[in-house]
Amino acid sequence: MSKNLLLIFTRNPELGKVKTRLAKSIGNDKALKVYIELLNQTKRFTENLPCDKIVYYSENINCKDIWDLHTYRKELQSGNDLGNRMANAFKQGFSEAYDKIIIIGSDLYDLTSDIILEAFERLDSNDVVLGPATDGGYYLLGMKELIPSIFRNKEWGTASVFSSTLKDIADKKVFLTKELNDIDVVTDMENHPVLNSFL
């Protein structure tokens, strides 16, 4: 067992339930195809990372999807909002004696294994690692112990999440990774020829 754990939060890829903001512009069918490609990309840059990995599903666990059971453990998200679900996943990980835990989503095409590896390394000398997203949220969060305030009193999915989180950890030593753009609306896809092929 590694002492490092990567949590990957996903939505079950079901028509009409993923990338709903994107779907308003390109329709549910294409939005689903884009999300499936984002899931595949997430698998590509995480599968060879030297850490333990858990995929957290939003609705139900699929034992026969792209996530290989030899590489990824599978769990179901639990909680009444995103903050609660993430907090519960971190709690579970720390209860299993992991030293460093990082959580990512599954809607970034530009996230790389190197960014995640650096985030784990930076936790040696920092309390928190945070990856800012261009929309005002964050795409990566890493900790060595649970900091409950991070997950409370947030307007999840809005542009205030990143700045609000920084206020919660003002007394902690924080490292920020490079800013990345998650894929939520059509303009987010402009620099990605692979994703543009779905338009």
Stretches with model-predicted labels:
Residues L111-G137:
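Conserved donor-nucleotide/metal-binding helix-loop-beta segment in metal-dependent transferases, i.e.
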Residues S163-L199:
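Conserved alpha/beta core of the MobA/IspD/sugar-nucleotide pyrophosphorylase nucleotidyltransferase superfamily
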Residues K33-C51:
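A short, N-terminal amphipathic alpha-helix
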Residues I147-L166:
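Short, glycine-/small-residue-rich phosphate/pyrophosphate-handling segment
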Residues M1-R21:
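N-terminal nucleotide-binding beta1-loop-alpha1 segment
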Residues P50-Y72:
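Acidic donor-binding segment of Leloir-type glycosyltransferases
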Residues D68-K100, T158:
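Short phosphate-binding loop-to-helix
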Residues I102-I104:
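Short aromatic-hydrophobic micro-motifs that form the base-stacking/packing surface
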